[in-house]
Amino acid sequence: MLTLLSYFGFLFAILTLTSVLFIGLNKIQLI
């Protein structure tokens, strides 16, 4: 159970980081 929770937390962190980086790159390109 603990490993599953940590695995999902890791996936969520990666998805959040990639989405933030993607939005940041799009904003830089829009300027």
Curated annotation (Swiss-Prot):
Keyword Nucleotide-binding: no
Keywords: Chloroplast, Electron transport, Membrane, Photosynthesis, Plastid, Thylakoid, Transmembrane, Transmembrane helix, Transport
Subcellular location: Plastid, Chloroplast thylakoid membrane
Single GO MF descriptor: electron transporter, transferring electrons within cytochrome b6/f complex of photosystem II activity
Statement: the UniProt record of this protein carries the keyword Transcription regulation: no
Coiled coil: none
Highest taxon of source: Eukaryota
Residues passing through the membrane, by range: 4-24
GO biological process: photosynthesis
InterPro entries the UniProt entry points to: Cyt_b6/f_cplx_su6
Gene Ontology CC: chloroplast thylakoid membrane; cytochrome b6f complex
One Pfam family hit: PetL
UniProt topology in membrane: Single-pass membrane protein
Principal subcellular localization: plastid
PANTHER family according to UniProt: CYTOCHROME B6-F COMPLEX SUBUNIT 6
Subunit structure: The 4 large subunits of the cytochrome b6-f complex are cytochrome b6, subunit IV (17 kDa polypeptide, PetD), cytochrome f and the Rieske protein, while the 4 small subunits are PetG, PetL, PetM and PetN. The complex functions as a dimer.
Function description: Component of the cytochrome b6-f complex, which mediates electron transfer between photosystem II (PSII) and photosystem I (PSI), cyclic electron flow around PSI, and state transitions. PetL is important for photoautotrophic growth as well as for electron transfer efficiency and stability of the cytochrome b6-f complex.
Family: Belongs to the PetL family.
Name of the protein described by the UniProt record: Cytochrome b6-f complex subunit 6
Organism: Angiopteris evecta
UniProt lineage: Eukaryota, Viridiplantae, Streptophyta, Embryophyta, Tracheophyta
Name of the gene encoding the protein in the UniProt record: petL
